[in-house]
UniProtKB/Swiss-Prot annotation:
InterPro entries: Ferrochelatase (IPR001015), Ferrochelatase_AS (IPR019772), Ferrochelatase_C (IPR033644), Ferrochelatase_N (IPR033659). Keywords: Cytoplasm, Heme biosynthesis, Iron, Lyase, Metal-binding, Porphyrin biosynthesis. Fe cation binds at residues 214, 295. GO terms for biological process: heme biosynthetic process. It comes from Rhizobium etli (strain ATCC 51251 / DSM 11541 / JCM 21823 / NBRC 15573 / CFN 42). This is Ferrochelatase. Signal peptide: none annotated. PANTHER family: FERROCHELATASE, FERROCHELATASE, MITOCHONDRIAL. Catalyzes the ferrous insertion into protoporphyrin IX. It catalyses: heme b + 2 H(+) = protoporphyrin IX + Fe(2+). GO terms for molecular function: ferrochelatase activity; metal ion binding.
Length: 344
């Protein structure tokens, strides 16, 4: 609702209000594949205390002395393999932008709602988008971290950054944060249909379906992070919906970094062992990723496939993420409409 303009003093500045913002946020992406862009992105990502919980005095000498001098070039080459050449950006940026634009169309019946998107690391930043929404008259904002399963290193750090922005604002918008939706029926159904649709396009049937989630250090789980349990539940619900057994369906964890023990079983080791044990055909889906990105397009579709074939496997297929598909957008829309209740 906008205040009655006739009641304002003649010299009162025009102030937009009465709008509701929906801010979709994903992890982030470098602006380019060059060394400088990669280093800037990795620095922001790897200095986040939610991501690397080691004390700075222990971690920073390793980060600034070794990691940021060696990994930008290596990771940049990996990004080059899966870069959206047409738009000169990563596919994560492409899909996240598309999701925001499609969400705005799906919420066309809610006249006071504005939809925008941001990245936790890189651009556009969460702070800049909150500021933009506020300037456009949004005095209430729904913050949607695009992670079906909650983890401190993903969902919590998005929330942290939003609250950090609010600390600097004199006139703060009301802020709601979207909880996880790891067991949502629409989400599970969308995953199941994506599996069925993809497998029906093949002329072979997999002996094993892996549901590969991004890993976190085991120490984070032991300190109370619910991520592992939520991944397992998502996996179980998907397996049951597909009518599979534990003999032909596994939950695994990928993308480990550093010397610590991470959640297991590890995806790369599992793929290698399956091939060595004589399993000839496997499919891999990434239920925890809303959009395809480096970890799915390069780490799974390229690296894992190569490892499987090198160790004796025959057929390997990667099932795309839901991305900006109609089924994927149905999931996101359902969550947004649910969380907007009481505001619209």
């Amino acid at each position: 609702m906008t205040a009655d303009i006739s009641l304002r003093p003649a010299d009162h500045p025009a102030i937009k209000s009465g709008k509701i913002g929906v801010l979709l946020v994903n992890l982030g992406t470098p602006d380019g594949t060059d060394y400088t862009s990669m280093r800037r992105y990795l620095k922001e990502f790897l200095t986040d205390r939610r991501v690397i919980e080691w004390s700075p005095w222990k971690w920073y000498p390793i980060l600034f002395g070794i990691v940021l001098n060696t990994r930008p070039q290596k990771v940049g080459k990996a990004y080059e393999l899966i870069w959206n050449k047409e738009k000169n950006e990563s596919y994560l940026r492409t899909y996240t932008r598309n999701q925001a634009e499609l969400m705005a169309k799906r919420l066309h019946d809610l006249a006071n709602v504005k939809v925008d998107w941001a990245m936790r690391y890189g651009t556009p930043s969460i702070a800049s988008r909150i500021e933009t929404l506020k300037q456009e008259g949004c005095d209430r904002i729904l913050l949607f971290p695009l992670y079906p399963q909650y983890a401190a290193a993903t969902t919590a750090t998005v929330n942290d950054k939003a609250f950090q922005k609010l600390l600097s604002m004199r006139w703060q918008p009301a802020l709601r944060t979207v909880p996880d939706y790891h067991d949502d029926e629409t989400y599970i159904e969308a995953l199941a249909q994506s599996v069925e649709r993809h497998l029906s396009s093949l002329d072979w049937k997999p002996d094993m379906l892996l549901a590969s989630f991004h890993g976190i250090p085991m120490s984070y789980f032991k300190q109370g992070d619910p991520y592992y349990c939520q991944c397992q539940k998502t996996g179980r619900l998907l397996r049951e919906r597909l009518g599979l057994t534990q003999e032909n369906f596994m939950v695994t964890f990928q993308s480990r970094f550093g010397p610590e023990e991470w959640l297991q079983p590890y995806t790369d080791k599992t793929v290698e062992k399956l091939a060595q044990d004589g399993v000839k055909r496997i499919a891999v889906i990434n239920p925890g990723f809303v959009s395809d990105c480096l970890e799915t397009l390069e780490e799974i579709a390229e690296q894992a496939a190569h490892s499987f074939h090198e160790n004796g496997g025959d057929k390997f297929t990667h099932i795309p993420c839901l991305n900006d598909s109609d089924d994927g957008m149905k999931v996101l829309e359902k969550v947004v409409r649910r969380e907007l209740q009481g505001w619209v």
